[in-house]
Amino acid sequence: MWVQGHSSRASATESVSFSGIVQMDEDTHYDKVEDVVGSHIEDAVTFWAQSINRNKDIMKIGCSLSEVCPQASSVLGNLDPNKIYGGLFSEDQCWYRCKVLKIISVEKCLVRYIDYGNTEILNRSDIVEIPLELQFSSVAKKYKLWGLHIPSDQEVTQFDQGTTFLGSLIFEKEIKMRIKATSEDGTVIAQAEYGSVDIGEEVLKKGFAEKCRLASRTDICEEKKLDPGQLVLRNLKSPIPLWGHRSNQSTFSRPKGHLSEKMTLDLKDENDAGNLITFPKESLAVGDFNLGSNVSLEKIKQDQKLIEENEKLKTEKDALLESYKALELKVEQIAQELQQEKAAAVDLTNHLEYTLKTYIDTRMKNLAAKMEILKEMRHVDISVRFGKDLSDAIQVLDEGCFTTPASLNGLEIIWAEYSLAQENIKTCEYVSEGNILIAQRNEMQQKLYMSVEDFILEVDESSLNKRLKTLQDLSVSLEAVYGQAKEGANSDEILKKFYDWKCDKREEFTSVRSETDASLHRLVAWFQRTLKVFDLSVEGSLISEDAMDNIDEILEKTESSVCKELEIALVDQGDADKEIISNTYSQVLQKIHSEERLIATVQAKYKDSIEFKKQLIEYLNKSPSVDHLLSIKKTLKSLKALLRWKLVEKSNLEESDDPDGSQIEKIKEEITQLRNNVFQEIYHEREEYEMLTSLAQKWFPELPLLHPEIGLLKYMNSGGLLTMSLERDLLDAEPMKELSSKRPLVRSEVNGQIILLKGYSVDVDTEAKVIERAATYHRAWREAEGDSGLLPLIFLFLCKSDPMAYLMVPYYPRANLNAVQANMPLNSEETLKVMKGVAQGLHTLHKADIIHGSLHQNNVFALNREQGIVGDFDFTKSVSQRASVNMMVGDLSLMSPELKMGKPASPGSDLYAYGCLLLWLSVQNQEFEINKDGIPKVDQFHLDDKVKSLLCSLICYRSSMTAEQVLNAECFLMPKEQSVPNPEKDTEYTLYKKEEEIKTENLDKCMEKTRNGEANFDC
């Protein structure tokens, strides 16, 4: 990025080459003497230093960084600890090369400035990428004093003192390093000399380090190393080194002597080439590097002491200056406050002088205004503030409390015994045992009948409805005053606390009102006496002092009493009072609702008892007859026999050498009529079965046991779907070869309705499973009451000659989504209408704990292009078997990712297939982009925002949406918009409808030819 974004700057600094710098770092000379300058101290034996010969390199690095880094971008993504970055040093706001040591948090990192050795915690925003030409080894090297190490038991204070001491000997001073060895981490172990002073010996004398034990291999000392993280953090707490305060990123100032002359010439050459390099004013004097080797250690200590004293005095000076400024600011603030207080005092004095002139007038007017309010309040009943309405409600609840009727408990016991007797009959398998249980049940019925009569009589005698009306009115009136009640525990302690509070408040208010009356009476008496004093017509001697005495006290007392009464009457109650009233209100409302629930329970039981009594009278000691059902079955048997005979007769006439057309036509009409009669009787049979099923479930569970010949138990287990009177050969069926790839399908007509017969091969075990699964599906459809969104099942019957089960369903030609989209795709409005119906179908199934597992474009139907319904599934397969088939719609798999991973099918997998179908209908012929999990990407399509949101929830995010939530999605709740007429679309749709009508007409003709024996497969 730096090369692309700053090519112009890069070209301007082409003369600055770093190849030499890299070469210098790569040349490592052991057993040599190096002249270095200390740049950073880590501890009493470890420090970082820069070679004297690298001064010019540091200048070049600083110039390049100052140009590159401000324009570079902050580092994104993960930080590489082996990579060199540019870091903004906090002290001088200049850029230096650094490496990341540790990631502290998302925003902060610990870095080391590799050309100086010190560390700092930086924000990620202060770290930038630098070009490859600046990615070379560090200028500063890490050194360790030869033969020394820090004692493992050294205290922190001594450790810090040792670090400071070594800094006074080495930091920013020219020292000679006699290299002895190099450790594995690159630390150079050397003997350090400053002039004639052996720095290691001085550190050892001070006790800040101790000698190492000689190693067997090298002279490298064995030392217990400090944790690098702890050492870095400890160095962070130490004072910022002086090199951090330099400007323009220079490390050393201009050298003295021959080094100064050489650098001046070099810089002059660079200035002539166009690369201006300036030196800061506060740069360190390189002359300090050339201190004479004869400088004594005592001189070093004196210099260090003077530096420390100067720093201390400077700190004290700064502190005093800050204190002076703070005091000066405080004096100014106090002066301003004093001036404000003087102005306020003058205003107050003027106000008091004005007030005193009108004091009596103002006070009497205020008292008169309060008296007007008090008169109005005396005419208002404020007892509600003391919970009078709650007290009245409690009294109503206590006085007319409705209790559970005595006969109800006995009724519940007998009813439970009766229900148990019915259950025993239901589970009984032997007729002899069943007869005994039936006799016991009948005896229990007699007792139950008498108990029901007693209960009805007791309820009739009680004023149940009147009490309920009273409670409802009371509840409404209280809710109008107090609003929503909070939930709380039912406790008599709350009511006791309320009564105590009410008595205290009433007593307090009575006392205050009496005090107000007394004060007003005293004030009136004073005015009457005063009137006589100033009335010249009154004869006699009156002492004015007696009349005028204590008027201020009288006014004060009167005002206080009036205000106190108004406060009680007008001011809002305190939190404690409100809490007591609120708790009491909640308690009262709970009692009201509890009694209402009891009354509602009794009323419901009363209603059930009335109905039970009516029906019980009809069936008491009686058993329903199945004769009518047997009569229907007998009629059906004869009709089916006659129908079969007519079919044989028709076949014989058609196969004769000289067929009589009129006779054949007559027999066909008779056959059609016989078929209609058969189905009419089958529907009558179903009605009779429904009636017997209702009786068996409610009154006579013994019916399946006593009359096994009618097959009532099978009918009940099938949910009313199974019929034993329908047979395959009774239907005029036409094979549907184009739809029979998986199972035999035939098309027929029943009472004017075109139906499909689906054939399933079954054995003994599969037959029961098919009936059970079809019955569960059928019950879900019936319970939805016409708004199921499911394909209805008409009949289920078993073939007597072959191991086949047949399912009769309505036939919707060319109405499945695959056919509709192939002929004329649904528009967006039609798609939403259809898919809302499909969502309703899935909701119906999932509500009944049924997982479809086989939702695809061939078994979802769009009736009239606006009503969507979900087709049935293969009832011979379990849900796992159905879901294991990978159905495709175009290039899109309808199998959810969890199914592909081997997890069981769930409502979520149904909704995934639903979402894929909705996406397919919405984008039509556009290509899908699939990710590695097989999930289609939705964002690539331009769809309505609400539809896209639903698709993302169903397909991409895989949120735990339910079918009910899908049904209530915003895209399905949009108001119907007035669609703009599209003549081309209307014409296309009209042609499509005509084409469909022609196809249907041809299909009907073909069906008729099949009936006449003239069918061919070209129609």
From Swiss-Prot:
Binding site for ATP: 716-724, 737
A molecular function (GO) term: protein serine/threonine kinase activity
Keyword ATP-binding: yes
Record domain Protein kinase: where: 710-1019
UniProt keyword list: ATP-binding, Coiled coil, Kinase, Nucleotide-binding, Serine/threonine-protein kinase, Transferase
Catalysed reactions, semicolon-separated: L-seryl-[protein] + ATP = O-phospho-L-seryl-[protein] + ADP + H(+); L-threonyl-[protein] + ATP = O-phospho-L-threonyl-[protein] + ADP + H(+)
Residues making up the signal peptide according to the UniProt record: none
Tissue: Testis specific.
EC number(s) on file: 2.7.11.1
Pfam families, A to Z: Pkinase, TUDOR
Keyword Hydrolase: no
Superkingdom: Eukaryota
Stretches assigned to coiled coil: 298-355
Domain Tudor: 78-137
Broad EC category: transferase
InterPro entries documented for this protein: Kinase-like_dom_sf (IPR011009), Prot_kinase_dom (IPR000719), Ser/Thr_kinase-like (IPR052451), SNase_OB-fold_sf (IPR035437), Tudor (IPR002999), Tudor_TDRD8 (IPR047383)
A GO term from the CC aspect: acrosomal vesicle
Annotated family: Belongs to the protein kinase superfamily. Ser/Thr protein kinase family.
Protein name per UniProt: Serine/threonine-protein kinase 31
Organism: Homo sapiens (Human)
Lineage: Eukaryota, Metazoa, Chordata, Craniata, Vertebrata
Gene designation: STK31
